[in-house]
Regions:
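Extracytoplasmic gate region of multi-pass secondary transporters
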Residues: 1-40
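Intracellular juxtamembrane helix-capping segments at the cytosolic ends
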Residues: 92-105
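Multi-pass alpha-helical transporter architecture, strongest
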Residues: 147-174
Length: 174
């Protein structure tokens, strides 16, 4: 969530950097919303069919692609692709953020697990705003920031792929 929060808070910086009209990103949020809602509906089916453990490594691939779009593209219409891709990742994240924990640890302590993960999520959004602000204050371009975020996402996806097999679901006793 920290990347999306940083992008949302500093959307005027993005627009200015890309020489887009002021309202391009706010208008593109409609695509974000639609992509997020469609993904929310479809990801439940995908979790039931494939399991969260198999899907979680690909959850942030659209976010990685959004950073590639932000890095390379200057055209205003790319804002719609950029936010649409973020919406897809956020839609997956909303479903996988709950179902993964239930799959791995069961539901007995799901309330405590969700409380802890939600606290981390809230902290990460605050951290994202600070990180983006520090980078912008230190003259990082939006392309530099997109590269840093993309690298972080790529490392995260790689770690998930490496460790995914070690997180076996719990066996329920009858």
């Amino acid at each position: 969530p920290w990347i999306f929060t940083g992008m949302a808070v500093y959307q005027s910086f993005i627009s200015d950097s890309k020489l887009w009209e002021t309202y391009t990103i706010p208008k593109a949020f409609m695509v974000y919303s639609i992509a997020s809602i469609v993904t929310l509906f479809s990801s439940g089916y995908l979790v039931d069919k494939f399991t969260s453990r198999k899907l979680i490594p690909i959850m942030n691939v659209p976010l990685l692609l959004a950073m590639v779009v932000l890095f390379y593209s200057k055209q205003e219409f790319s804002a719609y692709f950029f936010l649409g891709l973020i919406g897809i990742s956020n839609g997956f994240g909303n479903i996988l953020g709950s179902s993964t924990w239930a799959e791995i640890y069961g539901v007995k302590y799901i309330g405590s697990i969700k409380a802890l993960t939600t606290a981390f999520m809230v902290f990460s959004t605050a951290l994202g705003t600070a990180v983006f602000g520090i980078l912008i204050d230190n003259d990082f371009t939006i392309e530099n920031i997109a590269f840093i975020c993309g690298s972080y996402i790529l490392i995260s996806i790689s770690i998930l792929i490496l460790f995914r097999k070690t997180l076996e679901p719990i066996k329920l006793e009858n």
